[in-house]
From Swiss-Prot:
Catalyzes the NADPH-dependent rearrangement and reduction of 1-deoxy-D-xylulose-5-phosphate (DXP) to 2-C-methyl-D-erythritol 4-phosphate (MEP). NADPH binds at T10, G11, S12, I13, N123, E125, G214. It comes from Shewanella baltica (strain OS223). It catalyses: 2-C-methyl-D-erythritol 4-phosphate + NADP(+) = 1-deoxy-D-xylulose 5-phosphate + NADPH + H(+). Mn(2+) binds at D149, E151, E230. It comes from the Bacteria. InterPro entries: DXP_reductoisomerase, DXP_reductoisomerase_C, DXP_reductoisomerase_N, DXPR_C, DXPR_C_sf, NAD(P)-bd_dom_sf. Pathway: Isoprenoid biosynthesis; isopentenyl diphosphate biosynthesis via DXP pathway; isopentenyl diphosphate from 1-deoxy-D-xylulose 5-phosphate: step 1/6. This is 1-deoxy-D-xylulose 5-phosphate reductoisomerase. Keywords: Isoprene biosynthesis, Manganese, Metal-binding, NADP, Oxidoreductase. 1-deoxy-D-xylulose 5-phosphate binds at K124, S150, E151, S185, H208, S221, N226, K227, E230. Its cofactor is Mg(2+); Mn(2+). It is an enzyme of class 1 (oxidoreductase). Its EC number is 1.1.1.267.
Length: 396
């Protein structure tokens, strides 16, 4: 029986994880649930899954949850960073699902790694912001790191065992690998007239053609910043050089990524676009369990298509690839700027195409600094957010 803590329990990844746990009740137990401020959702999850601990990041939300949670459930409600770090490092915890969106998930995820936990990584920002530190911490602690993002999970499944066992430290060329092909659907605006993009609304941007996701990642998919962040994540997870990584537009989202070998072989991982599949794979690895996802019906799929990315349509993708080439400072700046810009777009403060402008302005202007510690990373993140908000004020 694996005891699991779910960071981001009330989000879409959290819901999918709990669905897989419910389908395999003899193998997994919910030890802790972590959410920001969604009291009603957390209450429902506590009643359904009966964790030992329910942690609310928002202190007022924790008080509300304590007031409404039935005492008979005997669930401890906690709040504050110290309690959160205590939860993810607790001796009783075997596995941590790291699914808090954005920079907020970095510190607890890194602490789980340092504690040597089995970490299922759905928070791509952890590697985007702290790639080298994160990989080094994994190496020192002996933590097991498994990628949940559908693309990175697909790549992982297509790799030989010696690479799977050495994430972040592997040598792709020595294993006969020539390229990693990172696929992306192109989002809801793949075929939209370029002249119409500036007027696209948050509701339109969040209407992904294939995947069911939260608002932030949905907007990132529409700008293809999500693919850019995944490009950076892949660089750290698989220890790649820039020339070993390629982005391929694949509108059907059936092939989740591919690995090309020296002998001309290409191995692809395929399946219906449902996050329960990669989640179940990570939870059970190296075994396989029931995920609740219907198997792929090739006769219904009909055809698969592939295109090169259009950087005029997707400037955020180009910015992310450039930042990856520049290094850790640039990717930290880009991530922070993008979080501020996307939130402003979702709140109607800026237009869709202005997201890329905010990101570019921060990349050009925010002074870079040495990144030797988590404190350095968080300081640069905070500095970038201040500048991004100033940039918003100037263009709003």
């Amino acid at each position: 029986m694996q005891n699991m803590v779910i960071l981001g329990a009330t989000g879409s990844i959290g819901a999918s994880t709990l669905s897989v746990i419910s389908a395999n009740p003899l193998a997994y137990s919910v030890y802790g649930l972590v959410a920001n401020a969604s009291v009603d959702k957390m209450l429902a999850l506590c009643v359904a899954h009966k964790p030992k601990v329910a942690h609310m990041v928002d202190e007022a939300a924790a008080k509300q949850l304590r007031a409404v949670l039935p005492a008979t459930l005997n669930i401890q409600v906690t709040t504050g960073m110290n309690d959160l770090l205590g939860l993810v490092t607790a001796a009783e915890v075997d596995t941590v699902m790291a699914a808090i969106v954005g920079a907020a998930g970095l510190v607890p995820t890194l602490e789980a790694v340092k504690a040597g936990k089995r970490v299922l990584l759905a928070n791509k920002e952890a590697l985007v912001m702290s790639g080298e530190l994160f990989i080094e911490a994994t190496k020192r602690s002996g933590a097991v790191l498994l990628p949940v993002d559908s693309e990175h999970n697909a790549i992982f499944q297509c790799l030989p065992q010696e690479v799977q066992a050495n994430l972040g430290r592997c040598d792709l060329a020595a294993s006969g690998i020539s390229h990693i092909l990172l696929t992306g659907s192109g989002g809801p605006f793949l075929r939209s007239d370029l002249a119409t993009l500036a007027a696209m609304t948050p509701a339109q941007a969040c209407k992904h053609p294939n995947w069911s996701m939260g608002p932030k990642i949905s907007v990132d998919s529409a700008t293809m910043m999500n693919k850019g962040l995944e490009f950076i994540e892949a660089r750290w997870l698989f220890n790649t050089q820039a020339e070993q990584l390629k982005v391929v537009i694949h509108p059907q989202s059936v092939i989740h990524s591919m690995v090309q070998y020296r002998d001309g072989s290409v191995i692809a991982q395929m399946g219906n676009p449902d996050m329960r599949t990669p989640i179940a794979h990570c939870m059970a690895y190296p075994q396989r369990i029931h995920s609740g996802v219907e198997p792929l019906d090739f006769f219904k799929v009909g055809q698969l298509s592939f295109y090169e990315p259009d950087f005029e349509r997707f400037p955020c993708l180009a910015l992310a690839m450039d930042a990856c080439a520049q290094g850790q400072e640039a990717t930290t700046v880009l991530n922070a700027a993008n979080e501020i810009a996307v939130e402003a777009f979702l709140q109607g403060q800026i237009g869709f195409t202005q997201i890329a402008k905010v990101n570019e302005a921060c990349l050009v202007t925010v002074p870079k600094r040495p990144m030797g510690s988590i404190e350095d990373i968080l300081a640069l993140d905070a500095q970038t957010r201040v500048y991004a908000r100033e940039t918003l004020a100037s263009i709003a």
